[in-house]
A protein has these predicted regions:
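Conserved SAM/AdoMet-binding glycine-rich loop
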Residues: 79-80, 88, 93, 190-313, ...
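Conserved, mostly hydrophobic/aromatic
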Residues: 161, 181, 198, 233, ...
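Short, solvent-exposed amphipathic alpha-helical segments in soluble enzyme
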Residues: 25-27, 120, 248-251, 275-278, ...
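Proteins enriched for Cys/Gly/acidic motifs involved in redox and nucleic-acid/cofactor modification
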Residues: 1-206, 244, 259, 281-292, ...
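Generic beta-strand/beta-sheet core signal
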Residues: 10, 199-201, 234-236, 262-264, ...
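A structural micro-motif
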Residues: 5, 33, 77, 101, ...
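Terminal RNA-binding accessory module
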Residues: 345-439
Length: 439
């Protein structure tokens, strides 16, 4: 198709959202659209939003208004809001944000070409398709760089955590077929991707809806036969991490010894209120087993402070757990009440300020742990995937112990270029970042 129109894509939120953005880019590319990062030159801007917590909603609205400000120098700019905010608040967006031309929910990503065509023609479409529709296979325009990419293996979630709106925005859990996943992985490997990051709301449930059993281990065995250097696992729920999966992670060199296991809390009362399966003791036992069975393992987790019912005793138990478990990477978030969730109706809610204070205290504990962990690398050699260069030309990258955007970096002297995998000797630590020299 001949098309002279130019589109800008702004992707907010989680890696799963970024994959949706990349799928939309590929559909637009096939339709002949060109892309730009310059909003002053774009005909249309798509803002793919998150609405998981209050801060994500605020970020999305601010980005919409910021994008609209470019109309002063680019009056023709059309704005499309897609993703979770659009799915959840389409009517409110239409009523309160006249800056928005098109609205496209999480069930309508495949309609992006027709939505862009409509807004460029002067229409104001609102599309919200079925959020639990079967997954469709579509190419992606990978935007993460020359050497790494996300691979989404499922969509939606069946876990029904009491604080979470994801099932109402993304639908029930739906696994992709193994054939579909492997075909995409082969294309990524052939394009030069060295690190494959496996994502879904809960990758440990992979296959249970399609094959009647969890199949993550089987899938990993097949993925590791392909030409990747690293395979990274994100969002494993604790209760489905079994011995077979642990053995595969421990024995397969391509699977990095870094696991992202969101636990949210350690106190049994709070876990029950969260509608999380398992107990604090089971979490402790799992982490102990993982460290025993997988030498050198680095753990990442997510925690929530201030859920209704969390008093000082429950919070202190969480702090004590952080000190004892010495989890190397963690994100701590103050509880955000979300309408339509069971937790939003619970009594005994602490104030927003108190939830924030507790999150900050947890992060102070975590900062000490992370600083101590960084010091252990001094004098060691690490494989580093080169991501870019500092303004002065110094290369930087990530080790297997660092996931993109959320963890640390390795900055080193040498002549490596983005996309390279090099060996670096670590000489020092600067504000949590490792400093070294290419060998």
């Amino acid at each position: 198709m001949n098309n002279s129109s130019t589109v800008a894509m702004i992707s907010l939120g989680c890696p799963k959202n970024l994959v949706n953005s990349e799928e939309m880019l590929a559909l637009l590319q096939d339709a002949g659209y060109a892309f730009t990062d310059d909003l002053a030159k774009a005909d249309a801007a798509i803002i793919n939003t998150c609405a998981f917590i209050e801060s994500a909603k605020t970020e999305a609205i601010e980005k919409i208004l910021e994008t609209a400000s470019y109309r002063e120098e680019n009056p023709k700019l059309k704005i499309i809001v897609s993703g979770c905010l659009a799915q959840r608040y389409a009517d409110d967006i239409r009523a309160e944000l006249p800056e928005v031309d098109g609205i496209m929910g999480t069930g309508s990503y495949s309609e992006v070409v027709s939505v862009v065509e409509a807004v460029l023609a002067g229409d104001k479409p609102t599309r919200r398709g079925a959020i639990s529709a079967p997954l469709y296979d579509t190419p992606r325009a990978v935007s993460t760089g020359p050497n790494w990419a996300y691979l989404r293996i499922a969509e939606g979630c069946d876990n029904r955590c009491a604080y979470c709106v994801i099932p109402s925005l993304r639908g029930k859990f739906r696994s992709r077929t193994k054939e579909s996943i492997l075909e995409e992985a082969r294309l990524l490997a052939a394009s030069g991707v060295k690190e494959l990051i496996i994502v879904a709301q809960d990758i440990t449930r992979y296959g249970i809806d399609l094959y009647g059993k969890v199949c993550l281990t089987e899938l990993l065995k097949e993925l590791c036969k392909l030409d990747f250097c690293w395979v990274r696992l994100h969002y494993l729920y604790p209760e489905l991490i079994d011995d077979e999966l642990i053995d595969e992670i421990a024995s397969e060199d391509k699977i990095v010894k870094y696991l992202d296991i969101p636990i949210q809390h350690i106190n049994d009362t709070i876990l029950r209120r969260m509608n999380r399966r398992g107990t604090g003791e089971e979490i402790r036992a799992l982490f102990k087993k993982l460290r025993e069975r997988i030498p050198g393992l680095v753990l990442r987790t997510s925690l929530i402070t201030g859920l209704p019912g969390e008093g000082e005793a429950e919070f202190e138990e969480l702090c004590d757990f952080l000190r004892e478990a010495k989890i190397e990477r963690a994100g701590v978030f103050p509880y955000s009440p979300e309408e339509g969730t069971p937790a939003a109706l619970m009594p005994d809610r602490c104030s927003t300020e108190e939830a924030q204070r507790r999150a900050e205290l947890c992060m102070e504990i975590q900062a000490e742990i992370m600083d101590g962990f960084a010091e252990t690398f001094i004098g060691r050699e690490l494989d580093v995937l080169v991501m870019g260069r500092e303004p002065d030309g110094t290369p930087w990258g990530r080790s297997e112990y660092d996931s993109p955007d959320i963890d640390s970096r390795v900055i080193f002297s040498g002549d490596a270029a983005p996309g390279d995998m090099v060996r670096v000797r670590i000489d020092s630590v600067d504000d949590g970042e490792l400093i070294g020299e290419q060998i």
